[in-house]
């Protein structure tokens, strides 16, 4: 707070014609920016600075500026201390994402929440896998939902962090993931990736009852979440939004007793407060900088999804 910095803009190629360069702040009460690109910290918080170069065609770039209070080192909201840190696809910075080694390492490091992705196979088995195709993680061009689990086991995970250290790293089932969560007393956070029908949702609901900790079920797909809520009135459900948390989205969440999940860059302190006023919890993703995560914790975010322990 109180510091000033001047943004440096580099034009490529060096001989390119640029008529004007303009600057804009998303919140002038936190940070102001002058016509020459000098930014001044006014209050603790997080803002976006947009730089626009106009040379006949406008090109924009955005940076985030985080302001801490000089005295306390935090934003001006008191630290709630209640935010839950969710590890994204296990400890994926130390083992391949969404594998039993990644989940086990998360548990060994003391993770309380571990997120994963679930898909239903041709034979009805639920497996832990993010992509619709095996190519990125297993090296074969096959759509996973067109396979049975016996077929999936032929293609172990061969890429990802330290993949060579984990031979025959088979894609786990949902049951195996829950067993790992139970072993380390972690709360499962499960994203539904498949377009489940009523039978699929019913089977999924039966499986997650094997979790000792009450799971959190999340998805971009609203329909399976609604079907799950109709048969399970108590499970925690988060509807993931692709853009900002709108009033319409909050009304929909209130209707079905959902919480809400969104990218942190699309969310501000006022939005979090508005959700809380409707008794809706807020989960934000995907944090890689502990300073930014700290800011959102101070704003009362209920869950923060991160790549590492924060």
Regions found by a protein language model. Give the residues of each.
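Phosphate-group recognition and catalysis centered on beta-loop-alpha active-site segments
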Residues: 48, 68-310
